[in-house]
């Protein structure tokens, strides 16, 4: 195996090359103002915008766990999961359709459940008043 050593000759031995040396070595020219004779071409790229489809999973889960009147919350949750699946596949139209159905079911469940709570409060308050009045009539008053 032969060892050939060649000396590296440079004017700036041991120093990094300056900007001027690099510019001359690679033939870099400075650019001036653009000439008006050049044709300017533009390229337009139409990027599809990201469509955010709300899937209402959290709302459906809330209705399923807390209200769930006539199982509407559970059905809304099923449609919400279908909407999320369609969104992951890339079917935006299908995701919007399932999300719309889930939203309608959630609204129906919420309204029905609120009405049921109001009716229960009314029934509880009227029965407690009636029971209180019946106890008041049975107990004799001790004359103070």
Curated annotation (Swiss-Prot):
Lipid group attachment sites (S-palmitoyl cysteine): 70-71, 104
Any one Pfam family match given in the protein's UniProt record, by short name: CD225
PTM annotation (Phosphotyrosine): residues: 19
Positions where N-acetylmethionine occurs in the chain: 1
Main location: membrane
Positions of transmembrane segments: 111-131
GO cellular component: late endosome membrane; lysosomal membrane; plasma membrane; protein-containing complex
UniProt superkingdom: Eukaryota
Membrane topology summary: Single-pass type II membrane protein
Intramembrane region spans per record: 57-77
UniProt record, GO biological process: cellular response to interferon-beta; defense response to virus; host-mediated suppression of symbiont invasion; response to virus
Function: IFN-induced antiviral protein which inhibits the entry of viruses to the host cell cytoplasm, permitting endocytosis, but preventing subsequent viral fusion and release of viral contents into the cytosol. Active against multiple viruses, including influenza A virus, SARS coronavirus (SARS-CoV), Marburg virus (MARV) and Ebola virus (EBOV), Dengue virus (DNV) and West Nile virus (WNV). Can inhibit: influenza virus hemagglutinin protein-mediated viral entry, MARV and EBOV GP1,2-mediated viral entry and SARS-CoV S protein-mediated viral entry.
Similarity section: Belongs to the CD225/Dispanin family.
PANTHER family in alphabetical order: INTERFERON INDUCIBLE TRANSMEMBRANE PROTEIN, INTERFERON-INDUCED TRANSMEMBRANE PROTEIN 2
This protein's name: Interferon-induced transmembrane protein 2
